[in-house]
Every structure is written in structure tokens, then in C-alpha cells.
Amino acid sequence: MILFWTSGLSIYLFLYIFKDKNADLRFIIFGSLFPVIFDSILYFFGLTNQNEYIGHSIFFTVSLFFIFMIATKRGSLFRANSLLFSIGSFFYLVLSFTWLNQSIILYPLFQNSEDIFSLAKNYKTVLGGAGILYLFFKFRNIQILKEFINTGKFIY
């Protein structure tokens, strides 16, 4: 029954929030079913022992969104439909109350434990690496670094 709840309400929320009557709502439905389908396939093939796993993670959904944004051509129908798919996946995570279970919604940051806010041991390394990568790309050369040190602004 939760699948009907998430699919139906995903369509309603999309139309209410975005007011796009021309969107292909099948991609919203498929996106709202994708986390369940993906995790069921992983469970069926024995890749996990949980029926709610990586497909229910916000990082997985955000990663899909970024991949669609980077890999598709702006203004194309494929991109529009891919974004609808991503929106449907986001709606599923909200409407299925996945956000109530931190070990699932924030996988792999949080591990299964009794402590409500027990972070995985390597989160500082991952976050630090992300920060280093960002700064590396922002400070492409010494001139940009000097300008930032002097003014606090980036040269684009």
C-alpha cells in the first residue's frame, strides 16, 4: 500500500509545487518506485540482507540527480524526464518516512547502532576529501589563490 501512497501523492505534490501540466508523470511514478525496486533487486540477488538499503539513501538519490544533470544535454527531453525521475525518488524518501531511520536515509554516514547520532568512523576523511577537491578546483593557479587571499573573492 505504501507504493500507491508514494506514487499517487508524488504526482499530486509535483503538480502542486511545480504546476507543470505538460510533464510526463510516468517518470515521477517510476522514480517514486525506483528505491524499492533497486533495493529489492539487491536483496533478491543476495547482495544485501536488508530490504531497505542503498536505494533508500539520500546520497544515492542526490548522486543520481547530479549524474543526470551532468550527463544529459540541457533542454533535452531526456534530461527533463531524468529530472522528473529524480524528483519522484526524492518524493518517495519523504513520503515513505525513510527520513525517520538515520541508518538508512544517511547511509553510509551512519551505521547501525543503538546511539542515535553515531557517525561512521571515516566521515571526517570523506568530508575532508570533498573539501580538498573543492578548493583544488577553485584555486586552479597561484593568481586565483593570491586574489582570494587579498580580497576574499574568487576570480571566475
What residues fall within each predicted segment?
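N-terminal membrane-targeting hydrophobic helices
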Residues: 1-156
